[in-house]
Amino acid sequence: MMVRDKIDVGILNPFINDPYIEDISVDGVGPIFIEHKIFKGLKSVVGWDNTDELDNFVIKLAERTKRPITYRNPIVDATLPDGSRINIVYSTDISRKGSNFTIRKAMDDPISILKLIEFKTCDYTMAAYLWICIENGMSLFMSGETASGKTTSLNAMTTFIPPENKIVTIEDTPELQVPHKNWCREVSKGKGSGEGEGSDVTMFDLLKAALRQRPNQILVGEIRGVEGAVAFGAMQTGHPVLSTFHAASVEKLIQRLCGDPINIPKTYVDNLNLVVIQSAVKRPSGEMVRRMLSINELVGFNPETQGFSFVEMFHWDPVTDTFEFTGKGSSFLLENRIATMLGIPEHKKAGIYFEVEKRARILERLHKAGYTSFYDLYHMMTKVKKQGLLTIDIDAI
């Protein structure tokens, strides 16, 4: 029996147990709303008729997260026992229609990079490019606006991290699911933990601790505050960092990094190697889809112009709904960083693009063979690497 099936959440049980429901939201007194994988936003026929019943339910729900909710601490961000993420706002003093909450359900099998390709969030070549970059220790921010699928895409990329690596994940609420055996999962502890004053453990604290744990990669659920300075310090000392970030473009990302409350010195920003911009976009049919709008390499900071240089590697064309490798032949990371790390001679550095093509072909073959499950894909990619398929001729794949 799965953990999810052992959790009794009363009126919410049918929604929790339905694998096609992604989100559950209650805006106050009234019906429960859901986000369905097929039918999208729907209003249910059940809910609450008065604030007292709703408040009592919310109190019990918060108790299941071990973060009790009170008038003094009326907002809780936490995780249910099955791993689902929940946000609760308590009482009519703050939420005028009555207590409200939103549950983002945890998935038993996270979405794999091949599933993202099926959804047309990205394509094989983009995935192959990210694979070679992440495998070779590049730092990356998955950036976009709310509900753009940043965490889902970042999690899918963890299959590109070498299987022998030690990974530390740091989050406010645990969402990332890493397939590696050597994985240290850490979660911050703030107000509402029920342990009294002085018991807080922040993202900043966890990041500082992570640097002493000798990780090969550090994954941060989201960088939004002073922990950003520690993350960039980690990058500067050779610890690759992968994280999500709220910004709709590279320019806005840099503005946020250099402004309050993160305050990264401009000369530090290029320690970040890659910025992937992802968004939820509306197609002509009216369907909302998620697309990686661009993948960008941060090249450097020019002190004379006070500007940043970045090169767009991939670009999404909204007219054709396809992706273009705009940076082919001009990648700073591939030619000047990764090719050197792989021991490719100067006069043969153009061959690094052949390596990207080879990996794209491997992903396509794995897709056709049916390895779309997150964990199945990870184990198969581990097997591929152990058998040396990355070094053989592409025609033999």
Regions flagged by a language model, labelled:
Residues 150:
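Conserved lysine of the Walker
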Residues 1-21, 72:
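Phosphate-interacting basic helix/loop segments used at nucleotide- and nucleic-acid interfaces
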Residues 26-27, 31-139:
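P-loop NTP-binding catalytic core
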Residues 354-397:
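Terminal-proximal interaction/regulatory segments of ATP-powered molecular machines
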Residues 274-364:
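Conserved P-loop NTPase
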Residues 129, 134-143, 156-282:
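Switch/coupling sub-region of P-loop NTPases
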Residues 147:
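Walker A (P-loop) phosphate-binding loop of P-loop NTPases
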